[in-house]
From Swiss-Prot:
Pfam families tied to this protein: Ribosomal_S5, Ribosomal_S5_C
Organism, as annotated: Saccharolobus islandicus (strain Y.N.15.51 / Yellowstone #2) (Sulfolobus islandicus)
Listed name of the protein: Small ribosomal subunit protein uS5
Any one biological process term the GO annotation gives: translation
Molecular functions (GO terms): rRNA binding; structural constituent of ribosome
HAMAP family named among the record's database cross-references: Ribosomal_uS5_A (MF_01307_A)
Length: 214
């Protein structure tokens, strides 16, 4: 179930990095500008300012044990998917003794991993030209899992696994097919492989990109 990312008081934010200062002072006014300038997200508050009204969903909760001198200590490990449903998506993990704290840490981690996703109409069966799917086939890997994402015609929907469907929905992709290899029952690796595939949408230079550069 999607929930809104808790907002912060921007006035109380004291940036710790030069990029954070640029954002707070209005020298960088959009998340697109940040990525166009090839600048990293150095503080989670940068995302709060440039990409408000994000939503997130907890997709995996595990109880993990850590061996200490005092014995085993149990902690929660949480995996969340975050996005604006319109071209930006992320994943994050967090560990803590309390579930609420683990979720907060996962949200903070996800803000640091925000990714722009290139969308398009890459299926030969569709010529609408709208950004409803992927521009081309992309592949992502994590552990033993490999995910292939393929563009689909408008109206197809997301013909993918349930967790992958959540990831693509948060990225703003409405139509896609997928094929997978490996141990897809491992939720974290499955999600990370899908995230890696979406990252690769910007690893290819299209003819349109060349035209814009010339």
């Amino acid at each position: 179930m999607a929930e809104e990312v808790p907002s912060i008081n921007i006035e109380e934010w004291k940036p710790r990095t030069s990029i954070g200062n640029l954002v707070k002072n209005g020298k960088i006014s959009s998340i697109k500008e940040l990525f166009d300038r090839n600048l990293p997200i150095t503080e989670p508050e940068i995302v709060d300012v440039l990409l408000p009204k994000l939503k997130y969903e907890v997709v995996d909760i595990k109880v993990v044990q850590k061996q200490t001198d005092a014995g085993e200590i149990s902690r929660y490990k949480v995996l969340v998917i975050m996005g604006n449903m319109d071209g930006y998506v992320s994943i994050g993990t967090g560990k803590a003794k309390q579930l609420r704290v683990a979720i907060q840490k996962a949200i903070r981690d996800a803000k640091m991993n925000i990714l722009p996703v290139r969308r398009g109409c890459g299926s030969w069966q569709c010529t609408c030209g709208e950004p409803h799917s992927l521009p081309f086939k992309v592949v992502g890997k994590a552990g033993s899992v490999e995910v292939n994402l393929l563009p689909a015609p408008k109206g197809t929907g997301l013909v993918v696994g349930s967790v992958l469907k959540t990831l693509l929905t948060y990225a703003g992709i409405r139509d896609a097919w997928s094929t997978t290899k490996g141990e897809t029952r491992t939720t974290e690796n499955f999600v990370r492989a899908g995230y890696s595939a979406l990252y690769n949408t910007y690893n290819f230079v299209t003819l349109q990109d060349w035209a814009r550069k010339r």
